[in-house]
Amino acid sequence: MIALEKLTYFYQHLPMRFDFHVKPGERIAILGPSGAGKSTLLNLVAGFLMADSGELRLNGESHRETSPAKRPVSILFQENNLFPHLTIGQNIALGLHPGLRLNAAQRATLQQIADRVGLTDLLDRLPSQVSGGQRQRAALARCLVRHQPILLLDEPFSALDPALRQEMLDLVESVCEERKFTLLMVSHNLDDAMRIAKRTVLIVDGQIYYDGPTQALQDGSADAAAILGISRSSSD
C-alpha cells in the first residue's frame, strides 16, 4: 500500500531519508523529537513536498512526482483548516466538489459521513458556532468523504483536552476498522500511539531510528525507547 525506498529529501542541505513499507489496512504511529522529520515524512507522502531521490509507491503506483490531488491520500492537520465563512456542511462538501455543486449521490455521501461522525445537527452552523472537537470532526469528515484508502494524521488532536482527544482517537480507530484504511499518524504522545497502532516508526534527525512494536517502546524493552525518555525500569 505504501512503499518508501531510500526516499530522500534535502532540508537545508541535510538529507532526510526514509525507507519502510506499510501493508494495506495497517496502522502506523510516527513518533520522534520535535523537528525530527515526522511532518516532513507525511508531506512527502501527501505530495506537499517533493523528494529529491528514491522511490515512493502508493497502491502499487509510483507517486514521487505526482501532485497531491492525484495521490490516493487524505490528510488531517492539527489546524482544521475550515473556512470560517462556510457552514460545517459546506466545509465537508469541499472534499467532494471544490465548487460545492453536489449531485444526489454526493449529498447522500455527505449526510452518511456527517451521521457517522456525529455532526448531523450541526451542518448549518459556522465553525465559530461549534466546539473545537466538533471542528476537528468536520475536518475528519471532509477527509472521509473523499474515499481515499490512505489516511494521514499530523497531530490533529493535540490541542484537544484529554477526554476529547480520546473520543477522537476512538472515532478514528472505528472508522479505520470499518473502511480498512491504511493509516500513518504523527504524534508526540506514546499513549495515543498505543491506542491506535501496534507498530511505530521512530524518527530521529530525519532518519528511521526504530521500526517495530509500539509495545516495546511503551515498556522500555526496545533500546530506542530511551529517545522518548523511557527505560525498562521507568516503565515498570
UniProtKB/Swiss-Prot annotation:
**What does the sequence similarity comment in the record state about its family?**
Belongs to the ABC transporter superfamily. Thiamine importer (TC 3.A.1.19.1) family.
Which key words tag this protein in UniProt?
ATP-binding, Cell inner membrane, Cell membrane, Membrane, Nucleotide-binding, Translocase, Transport
Enzyme Commission number(s) of this protein: 7.6.2.15
Q: What Pfam families would the database entry show?
A: ABC_tran
Q: What is this protein called?
A: Thiamine import ATP-binding protein ThiQ
Which species is the source of this protein? Pectobacterium atrosepticum (strain SCRI 1043 / ATCC BAA-672) (Erwinia carotovora subsp. atroseptica)
Q: Name one GO cellular component term.
A: plasma membrane
**Record's subunit section:** The complex is composed of two ATP-binding proteins (ThiQ), two transmembrane proteins (ThiP) and a solute-binding protein (ThiB).
Catalytic activity of the protein: thiamine(out) + ATP + H2O = thiamine(in) + ADP + phosphate + H(+)
Q: What class of enzyme is it?
A: translocase
The molecular function GO annotations come to:
ABC-type thiamine transporter activity; ATP binding; ATP hydrolysis activity
Q: What does this protein do?
A: Part of the ABC transporter complex ThiBPQ involved in thiamine import. Responsible for energy coupling to the transport system.
According to Swiss-Prot or TrEMBL, what is its membrane topology? Peripheral membrane protein
Query: In which compartments does the protein localize?
Result: Cell inner membrane
Q: Where does ATP bind?
A: G32, P33, S34, G35, A36, G37, K38, S39
Which segments constitute the ABC transporter domain?
2-230
InterPro entries documented for this protein: AAA+_ATPase (IPR003593), ABC_SmlMolc_Importer (IPR050093), ABC_transporter-like_ATP-bd (IPR003439), ABC_transporter-like_CS (IPR017871), P-loop_NTPase (IPR027417), Thiamine_ABC_ThiQ (IPR005968)
